[in-house]
């Protein structure tokens, strides 16, 4: 055998070994192409999932491609119950109608709380009259009957300016919208419609920053890095276990005193997708690292016991939801995980 031919044969053999080794990394499919994990949903949960996805893809060295979209919690669930994505990011629990659609389409799901958020009521930094508001005052502003009627600051408190309120809030497909309206107005989606709405929280940040008479609500993770551009309003709730107005902060959320605007955040994983090795690895990686990564993007990790319970739910492939198809205000996340899930 000629030396050149021997060298070529050896080179081909080495390439075959290397190709086999690369193809054997978790996640790649039988053709050797990178596996794809499709995620969509909440803009609130997006920063956490994006951070986890980046770390996971780095670890997998190109063997897995994770796509993370933002279409709002409702938009993400629409895709999820049609079987179009593997994971749905959600800033509120799955609703009754979404549960019904999933069942009709044969979609089973694993519900996993992954972090806490504090919905933050914000005003412009030039606003020198508002430091706190009661839940009753917020309801007066945001309930459906307020549309076209409660339009000026002095209608909330007589001593406040007779200036028109510029309202900014979440769009109707947002889980933030569902939770805020449930917590403040008493019913999901019960809201006035004459305000600037967006599923993109950065749009709301810019709107409040640009108007001295603005009032809005956004997730804490979008407030924290922009706290010089807007001011958080302390919230007073007559049902709270402490008296007085409470500002949103990691300490107050973990202490259980920032109510009713503290909430758990979720990912929903398709049971069918869990049969894909890449998805199973990603979900395990998510629960292992989310506590650290959530803090990096200004969210609040759950207690360690909650993550352990979530891991048990994954390992046993326990499907269904711990909720009754509606958001529940002020509920400890451990209680959610202890409930028998239902489809």
Where are these regions (language model features)?
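C-terminal motif of bacterial Sec signal peptides marking the signal peptidase cleavage site
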Residues: 17-21
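Flexible loop/hinge segments at secondary-structure junctions
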Residues: 22-343
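Short, linear, compositionally biased motifs with a strong N-terminal bias
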Residues: 11-14
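Bacterial N-terminal signal peptides that target proteins for export
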Residues: 1-9
């Amino acid at each position: 055998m000629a030396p050149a031919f021997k060298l070529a044969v050896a080179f081909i053999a080495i390439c075959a070994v290397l190709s086999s080794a690369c193809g054997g990394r978790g996640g790649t499919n039988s053709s050797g192409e990178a596996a794809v994990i499709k995620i969509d949903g909440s803009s609130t949960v997006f920063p956490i999932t994006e951070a986890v996805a980046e770390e996971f893809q780095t670890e997998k060295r190109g063997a897995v491609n994770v796509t993370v979209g933002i279409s709002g919690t409702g938009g993400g669930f629409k895709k999820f119950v049609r079987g179009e994505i593997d994971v749905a990011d959600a800033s509120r629990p799955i609703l009754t109608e979404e549960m019904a659609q999933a069942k009709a389409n044969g979609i089973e799901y694993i519900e996993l709380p992954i972090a806490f958020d504090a919905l933050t009521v914000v005003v412009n930094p030039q606003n020198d009259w508002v430091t706190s508001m009661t839940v009753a005052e917020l309801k007066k502003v945001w309930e459906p009957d307020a549309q076209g009627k409660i339009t000026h600051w002095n209608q909330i408190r007589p001593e406040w300016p007779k200036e028109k309120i510029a309202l900014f809030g979440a769009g109707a497909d947002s889980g933030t919208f569902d939770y805020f309206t449930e917590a403040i107005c008493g019913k999901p989606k019960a809201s006035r419609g004459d305000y600037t709405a967006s599923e993109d929280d950065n749009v709301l940040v810019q709107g409040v920053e640009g108007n001295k008479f603005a009032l809005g609500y956004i997730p804490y993770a979008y407030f924290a890095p922009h706290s010089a551009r807007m001011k958080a309003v302390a919230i007073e709730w007559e049902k709270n276990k402490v008296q007085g107005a409470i500002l949103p902060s990691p300490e107050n959320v973990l202490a259980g005193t920032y109510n009713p605007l503290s909430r758990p955040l979720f990912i929903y994983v398709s049971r069918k997708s869990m049969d894909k090795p890449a998805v199973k690895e990603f979900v395990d990686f998510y629960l292992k690292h989310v506590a650290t990564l959530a803090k990096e993007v200004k969210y609040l990790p759950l207690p360690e016991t909650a993550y352990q319970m979530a891991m048990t739910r994954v390992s046993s492939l326990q499907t269904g939801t711990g909720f009754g198809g509606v958001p529940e205000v002020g509920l400890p996340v451990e209680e959610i995980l202890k409930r028998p899930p239902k489809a």
